[in-house]
């Protein structure tokens, strides 16, 4: 007599488990499905975007990739041991008076990729471990990291976000609202060609390394800038946002023939996996492109 009653209970438990899993799915904002030339974002539009702060001041962006981990750029940290100086702001749309949906988290440790050797170097990635797991909300959610099988095709439109300067000369005006900018992926041979141009104007040729990715416009005018470093370049693949790159470097901001250069996340899959073994990566079969 009691046995049939166990079936609905089992179904209920399975359903509850699926709901809990769906509630923490990466790369899916719940609210919605200032860069150079950028535009204001909406509340909860990019719930993985974080502000990394030193002594209370924003200096780099980053992305929440797990409840206790943030992905950013290695060049953001000159001294990875002074963790007491750093804090991470999550769930914020603006830096001045972030609002009720935002929270601050302390930093436990910073792991910079040991292969990073300085400005415009390969391996410009770092992982920031927070002191405690953060609760996922409508405004705080992780972005998906792509499996190495995922290829972000040339011309694909992706988005870069951050609180950086709107130009080389100006600061983002208060209340410093998070900016977003759509940028197309540029293939590496073309990007190398662009970075070899204009040497008569004093530019030094730069080489786009194997773990780098270019995105932006040949004519310039729109780009990430100072203060955006470490932030995410994300692409909508299927129904999920995958982080293709980490904002790394460029020649000035939004200059002609000088698109933004990002560190390719898939190139550092093994390093990230070593530090966060339980982190799951989104494979190409779930919507990626080959």
Curated annotation (Swiss-Prot):
GO MF annotation, one: serine-type endopeptidase activity
Compartments reported by the entry: Secreted
CDD domains documented for this protein: Tryp_SPc
This protein's UniProt keywords: Disulfide bond, Glycoprotein, Hydrolase, Protease, Secreted, Serine protease, Signal, Zymogen
Coiled-coil spans in chain: none
Record-annotated active site: 75, 124, 229
Signal peptide positions (record): 1-22
Propeptide: 23-34
PTM text: N-glycosylated.
PROSITE patterns xref list: TRYPSIN_DOM, TRYPSIN_HIS, TRYPSIN_SER
Peptidase S1 domain location: 35-277
Enzyme Commission number, as recorded: 3.4.21.-
One protein family per Pfam: Trypsin
Biological process, per Gene Ontology: proteolysis
Residues modified by glycosylation: 55, 79
Gene Ontology CC annotations of this record: extracellular region; plasma membrane
Domain of life: Eukaryota
Disulfide bridge positions per record: 60-76, 158-235, 191-214, 225-253
Organ and tissue specificity: Expressed predominantly in the pancreas.
Family membership noted in the UniProt record: Belongs to the peptidase S1 family.
Name used for this protein in its record: Serine protease 27
Native source species: Homo sapiens (Human)
